[in-house]
Protein backbone atom coordinates (compact mmCIF):
# COMPACT_ATOMS: atom_id res chain seq x y z
CA UNK A 1 0.00 0.00 0.00
CA UNK A 2 2.78 2.41 0.96
CA UNK A 3 4.72 1.58 -2.21
CA UNK A 4 1.92 3.04 -4.32
CA UNK A 5 2.10 6.49 -2.68
CA UNK A 6 3.36 9.13 -5.10
CA UNK A 7 6.29 11.12 -3.63
CA UNK A 8 5.51 14.79 -3.02
CA UNK A 9 7.28 17.61 -4.81
CA UNK A 10 7.75 21.25 -3.80
CA UNK A 11 6.82 24.32 -5.81
CA UNK A 12 10.25 25.89 -6.28
CA UNK A 13 8.85 29.23 -7.45
CA UNK A 14 9.00 30.62 -3.90
CA UNK A 15 11.15 27.90 -2.32
CA UNK A 16 14.37 29.49 -1.01
CA UNK A 17 17.09 27.79 1.05
CA UNK A 18 18.77 30.06 3.61
CA UNK A 19 20.68 29.87 6.89
CA UNK A 20 18.18 30.46 9.74
CA UNK A 21 21.00 31.58 12.06
CA UNK A 22 22.14 34.32 9.68
CA UNK A 23 19.95 37.47 9.47
CA UNK A 24 21.64 38.50 6.22
CA UNK A 25 20.75 35.13 4.73
CA UNK A 26 17.11 35.72 5.73
CA UNK A 27 17.19 39.14 4.06
CA UNK A 28 18.61 37.53 0.92
CA UNK A 29 15.79 34.99 0.98
CA UNK A 30 13.27 37.85 0.94
CA UNK A 31 15.20 39.56 -1.86
CA UNK A 32 14.83 36.36 -3.87
CA UNK A 33 11.07 37.06 -3.99
CA UNK A 34 11.50 40.48 -5.65
CA UNK A 35 10.87 39.13 -9.21
CA UNK A 36 7.57 37.61 -8.09
CA UNK A 37 6.63 40.88 -6.40
CA UNK A 38 7.46 42.81 -9.57
CA UNK A 39 5.19 40.51 -11.58
CA UNK A 40 2.36 41.40 -9.18
CA UNK A 41 3.19 45.09 -9.68
CA UNK A 42 3.14 44.64 -13.46
CA UNK A 43 -0.25 42.90 -13.36
CA UNK A 44 -1.70 45.53 -11.03
CA UNK A 45 -0.49 48.46 -13.13
CA UNK A 46 -1.67 46.89 -16.38
CA UNK A 47 -5.14 46.24 -14.99
CA UNK A 48 -5.53 49.59 -13.22
CA UNK A 49 -3.93 51.94 -15.78
CA UNK A 50 -4.24 50.10 -19.14
CA UNK A 51 -1.05 51.95 -20.15
CA UNK A 52 0.63 50.80 -23.37
CA UNK A 53 4.09 51.58 -21.98
CA UNK A 54 3.55 49.30 -18.98
CA UNK A 55 2.27 46.53 -21.25
CA UNK A 56 5.27 46.94 -23.55
CA UNK A 57 7.68 46.81 -20.61
CA UNK A 58 6.06 43.63 -19.28
CA UNK A 59 6.18 42.08 -22.75
CA UNK A 60 9.90 42.85 -22.85
CA UNK A 61 10.29 41.32 -19.40
CA UNK A 62 8.67 38.10 -20.61
CA UNK A 63 10.90 38.09 -23.70
CA UNK A 64 13.91 38.48 -21.41
CA UNK A 65 12.74 35.48 -19.38
CA UNK A 66 12.36 33.47 -22.58
CA UNK A 67 15.93 34.40 -23.52
CA UNK A 68 17.14 33.24 -20.10
CA UNK A 69 15.28 29.94 -20.53
CA UNK A 70 17.00 29.39 -23.88
CA UNK A 71 20.46 30.44 -22.65
CA UNK A 72 20.36 28.08 -19.68
CA UNK A 73 19.57 25.10 -21.90
CA UNK A 74 22.16 26.17 -24.44
CA UNK A 75 25.03 26.69 -21.97
CA UNK A 76 24.01 23.91 -19.52
CA UNK A 77 26.25 25.06 -16.67
CA UNK A 78 25.36 23.58 -13.28
CA UNK A 79 24.72 25.56 -10.12
CA UNK A 80 27.33 25.59 -7.31
CA UNK A 81 27.86 22.16 -5.76
CA UNK A 82 26.54 23.15 -2.31
CA UNK A 83 23.10 24.27 -3.50
CA UNK A 84 22.97 21.54 -6.15
CA UNK A 85 23.34 18.91 -3.42
CA UNK A 86 20.31 20.30 -1.53
CA UNK A 87 18.05 19.73 -4.48
CA UNK A 88 18.38 22.99 -6.39
CA UNK A 89 16.76 22.54 -9.77
CA UNK A 90 17.77 23.80 -13.19
CA UNK A 91 20.96 25.16 -14.68
CA UNK A 92 22.76 28.13 -13.20
CA UNK A 93 24.13 30.05 -16.20
CA UNK A 94 22.95 32.78 -16.44
CA UNK A 95 21.18 33.67 -13.20
CA UNK A 96 17.49 34.23 -13.98
CA UNK A 97 17.03 36.46 -10.91
CA UNK A 98 19.93 38.69 -11.92
CA UNK A 99 18.73 38.86 -15.52
CA UNK A 100 15.14 39.64 -14.46
CA UNK A 101 15.95 42.50 -12.10
CA UNK A 102 18.64 43.91 -14.42
CA UNK A 103 16.13 44.16 -17.26
CA UNK A 104 13.57 45.79 -14.95
CA UNK A 105 16.00 48.34 -13.50
CA UNK A 106 17.58 49.32 -16.83
CA UNK A 107 14.24 49.43 -18.67
CA UNK A 108 12.73 51.58 -15.92
CA UNK A 109 15.74 53.89 -15.96
CA UNK A 110 15.63 54.27 -19.74
CA UNK A 111 11.94 55.11 -19.57
CA UNK A 112 12.30 57.66 -16.77
CA UNK A 113 15.42 59.36 -18.15
CA UNK A 114 14.99 59.09 -21.93
CA UNK A 115 11.29 58.68 -22.71
CA UNK A 116 9.22 60.19 -19.90
CA UNK A 117 8.90 63.93 -20.68
CA UNK A 118 5.87 65.47 -18.89
CA UNK A 119 6.32 69.00 -20.31
CA UNK A 120 2.84 69.82 -21.55
CA UNK A 121 1.34 68.36 -18.43
CA UNK A 122 3.55 70.58 -16.28
CA UNK A 123 2.30 73.72 -18.05
CA UNK A 124 -1.32 72.65 -17.67
CA UNK A 125 -0.80 71.86 -14.01
CA UNK A 126 0.80 75.25 -13.37
CA UNK A 127 -2.16 77.04 -14.92
CA UNK A 128 -4.68 75.02 -12.92
CA UNK A 129 -2.61 75.47 -9.77
CA UNK A 130 -2.68 79.25 -10.23
CA UNK A 131 -6.46 79.15 -10.60
CA UNK A 132 -6.78 77.13 -7.39
CA UNK A 133 -4.47 79.54 -5.57
CA UNK A 134 -6.60 82.51 -6.63
CA UNK A 135 -9.70 80.80 -5.22
CA UNK A 136 -7.87 80.07 -1.98
CA UNK A 137 -6.69 83.68 -1.70
CA UNK A 138 -10.29 84.87 -1.97
CA UNK A 139 -11.27 82.37 0.73
CA UNK A 140 -8.43 83.56 2.95
CA UNK A 141 -9.52 87.20 2.63
CA UNK A 142 -13.06 86.28 3.66
CA UNK A 143 -11.75 84.26 6.60
CA UNK A 144 -9.50 87.10 7.74
CA UNK A 145 -12.39 89.56 7.66
CA UNK A 146 -14.63 87.21 9.62
CA UNK A 147 -12.24 85.92 12.27
CA UNK A 148 -10.14 89.01 12.88
CA UNK A 149 -6.58 89.85 11.91
CA UNK A 150 -4.84 87.53 14.42
CA UNK A 151 -6.76 84.35 13.72
CA UNK A 152 -6.93 85.16 10.03
CA UNK A 153 -3.14 85.55 9.78
CA UNK A 154 -2.58 82.22 11.50
CA UNK A 155 -5.10 80.53 9.22
CA UNK A 156 -3.48 82.13 6.17
CA UNK A 157 -0.03 80.87 7.24
CA UNK A 158 -1.31 77.33 7.64
CA UNK A 159 -3.15 77.53 4.32
CA UNK A 160 -0.05 78.82 2.52
CA UNK A 161 2.03 75.97 3.95
CA UNK A 162 -0.56 73.42 2.81
CA UNK A 163 -0.64 75.06 -0.63
CA UNK A 164 3.16 74.85 -0.97
CA UNK A 165 3.11 71.19 0.05
CA UNK A 166 0.30 70.43 -2.41
CA UNK A 167 2.12 72.25 -5.21
CA UNK A 168 5.28 70.19 -4.59
CA UNK A 169 3.33 66.91 -4.45
CA UNK A 170 1.51 67.62 -7.72
CA UNK A 171 4.50 68.75 -9.77
CA UNK A 172 5.80 66.22 -12.32
CA UNK A 173 9.10 64.65 -11.38
CA UNK A 174 12.14 66.63 -12.43
CA UNK A 175 15.10 64.94 -14.12
CA UNK A 176 16.84 64.80 -10.73
CA UNK A 177 13.86 62.99 -9.18
CA UNK A 178 13.76 60.51 -12.04
CA UNK A 179 17.51 59.96 -11.77
CA UNK A 180 17.24 59.17 -8.06
CA UNK A 181 14.37 56.74 -8.73
CA UNK A 182 16.40 55.04 -11.47
CA UNK A 183 19.40 54.80 -9.15
CA UNK A 184 17.20 53.24 -6.47
CA UNK A 185 16.00 50.62 -8.94
CA UNK A 186 19.61 49.78 -9.84
CA UNK A 187 20.54 49.46 -6.16
CA UNK A 188 17.63 47.07 -5.58
CA UNK A 189 18.60 45.06 -8.65
CA UNK A 190 22.20 44.89 -7.42
CA UNK A 191 21.05 43.68 -4.00
CA UNK A 192 18.93 40.92 -5.54
CA UNK A 193 21.78 39.83 -7.81
CA UNK A 194 24.27 39.81 -4.92
CA UNK A 195 21.86 37.77 -2.78
CA UNK A 196 22.04 34.91 -5.27
CA UNK A 197 25.76 34.45 -4.65
CA UNK A 198 25.37 34.94 -0.89
CA UNK A 199 22.76 32.18 -0.72
CA UNK A 200 24.96 29.97 -2.90
CA UNK A 201 22.47 29.56 -5.73
CA UNK A 202 24.89 30.96 -8.33
CA UNK A 203 28.54 31.73 -8.85
CA UNK A 204 29.69 35.31 -9.35
CA UNK A 205 30.22 34.59 -13.04
CA UNK A 206 26.65 33.32 -13.46
CA UNK A 207 25.27 36.44 -11.76
CA UNK A 208 27.42 38.82 -13.81
CA UNK A 209 26.40 37.12 -17.05
CA UNK A 210 22.76 37.36 -15.94
CA UNK A 211 23.14 41.08 -15.25
CA UNK A 212 24.77 41.59 -18.63
CA UNK A 213 22.08 39.63 -20.46
CA UNK A 214 19.31 41.54 -18.68
CA UNK A 215 20.92 44.88 -19.49
CA UNK A 216 21.40 43.92 -23.14
CA UNK A 217 17.77 42.79 -23.41
CA UNK A 218 16.54 46.05 -21.84
CA UNK A 219 18.54 48.23 -24.24
CA UNK A 220 17.47 46.15 -27.24
CA UNK A 221 13.82 46.28 -26.18
CA UNK A 222 14.01 50.04 -25.69
CA UNK A 223 15.28 50.40 -29.26
CA UNK A 224 12.52 48.13 -30.57
CA UNK A 225 9.77 50.06 -28.76
CA UNK A 226 11.29 53.35 -29.95
CA UNK A 227 11.04 52.17 -33.56
CA UNK A 228 7.48 50.95 -32.95
CA UNK A 229 6.54 54.37 -31.60
CA UNK A 230 8.32 56.45 -34.23
CA UNK A 231 6.95 54.40 -37.12
CA UNK A 232 3.37 54.96 -35.95
CA UNK A 233 2.80 51.24 -35.50
CA UNK A 234 1.87 51.65 -31.84
CA UNK A 235 -0.76 54.25 -32.73
CA UNK A 236 -2.25 51.91 -35.31
CA UNK A 237 -2.37 49.06 -32.79
CA UNK A 238 -4.07 51.29 -30.23
CA UNK A 239 -6.81 52.01 -32.81
CA UNK A 240 -7.71 48.33 -33.16
CA UNK A 241 -11.28 47.68 -31.92
CA UNK A 242 -10.11 44.93 -29.56
CA UNK A 243 -7.46 47.19 -28.03
CA UNK A 244 -9.97 50.01 -27.67
CA UNK A 245 -12.40 47.59 -26.05
CA UNK A 246 -9.80 47.02 -23.32
CA UNK A 247 -9.38 50.84 -23.10
CA UNK A 248 -5.61 50.73 -23.58
CA UNK A 249 -4.09 54.21 -23.65
CA UNK A 250 -0.67 55.82 -24.07
CA UNK A 251 -0.49 58.74 -21.64
CA UNK A 252 2.28 57.90 -19.19
CA UNK A 253 5.02 59.12 -21.55
CA UNK A 254 3.84 62.70 -21.01
CA UNK A 255 1.78 62.24 -17.84
CA UNK A 256 2.56 60.95 -14.37
CA UNK A 257 0.64 57.84 -13.36
CA UNK A 258 -0.94 59.53 -10.28
CA UNK A 259 -2.22 62.30 -12.56
CA UNK A 260 -4.77 60.03 -14.25
CA UNK A 261 -8.19 61.11 -13.06
CA UNK A 262 -6.81 63.72 -10.65
CA UNK A 263 -8.35 66.70 -12.48
CA UNK A 264 -11.73 64.97 -12.52
CA UNK A 265 -11.47 64.31 -8.79
CA UNK A 266 -10.49 67.93 -8.13
CA UNK A 267 -13.47 69.21 -10.11
CA UNK A 268 -15.82 66.94 -8.17
CA UNK A 269 -14.26 68.00 -4.85
CA UNK A 270 -14.59 71.72 -5.64
CA UNK A 271 -18.16 71.27 -6.85
CA UNK A 272 -19.06 69.35 -3.69
CA UNK A 273 -17.61 72.08 -1.46
CA UNK A 274 -19.47 74.78 -3.36
CA UNK A 275 -22.73 72.90 -2.81
CA UNK A 276 -21.94 72.56 0.91
CA UNK A 277 -21.17 76.29 1.18
CA UNK A 278 -24.45 77.18 -0.52
CA UNK A 279 -26.33 74.97 1.92
CA UNK A 280 -24.60 76.66 4.87
CA UNK A 281 -25.41 80.11 3.45
CA UNK A 282 -29.09 79.19 3.30
From Swiss-Prot:
A Gene Ontology CC term for this entry? endoplasmic reticulum membrane
Q: Which GO terms describe its molecular function?
A: dolichyldiphosphatase activity
- Transmembrane regions: 26-46, 93-113, 173-193, 207-227
Family matches, as CDD domains: PAP2_dolichyldiphosphatase
Region Disordered, residue ranges: 121-153
- Which reactions is this enzyme annotated as catalysing? a di-trans,poly-cis-dolichyl diphosphate + H2O = a di-trans,poly-cis-dolichyl phosphate + phosphate + H(+)
Cell compartments where the protein resides: Endoplasmic reticulum membrane
Give the way it sits in the membrane: Multi-pass membrane protein
Decide whether keyword Cell membrane is in the record.
Answer: no
Instruction: Enumerate the Gene3D superfamilies for this protein.
Output: Phosphatidic acid phosphatase type 2/haloperoxidase
Q: Where in the sequence does UniProt note compositional bias of the Low complexity kind?
A: 138-148
Q: Does the keyword Transport apply?
A: no
Instruction: List keywords of the entry alphabetically.
Output: Endoplasmic reticulum, Hydrolase, Membrane, Transmembrane, Transmembrane helix
A Pfam family hit: PAP2
- Pathway this chain belongs to: Protein modification; protein glycosylation
BP GO annotations: protein N-linked glycosylation
**UniProt enzyme class:** hydrolase
Predominant cellular place of this UniProt entry's protein:
endoplasmic reticulum
Q: What is its EC number?
A: 3.6.1.43
PANTHER family for this protein = DOLICHYLDIPHOSPHATASE 1, PALMITOYL-PROTEIN THIOESTERASE/DOLICHYLDIPHOSPHATASE 1
The entry sums up its family as follows:
Belongs to the dolichyldiphosphatase family.
Query: What is the designated name of this protein?
Result: Putative dolichyldiphosphatase
Species whose genome carries this gene:
Neurospora crassa (strain ATCC 24698 / 74-OR23-1A / CBS 708.71 / DSM 1257 / FGSC 987)
Amino acid sequence: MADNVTPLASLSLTHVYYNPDDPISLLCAWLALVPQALCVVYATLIWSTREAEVILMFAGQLACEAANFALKRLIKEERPARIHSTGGKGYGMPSSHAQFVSFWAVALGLFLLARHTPREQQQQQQQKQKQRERKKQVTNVKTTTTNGSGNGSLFKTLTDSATDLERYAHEPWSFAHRFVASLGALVLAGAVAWSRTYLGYHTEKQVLVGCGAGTLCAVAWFVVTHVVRQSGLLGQILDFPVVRWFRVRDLVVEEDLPQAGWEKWEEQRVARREVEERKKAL
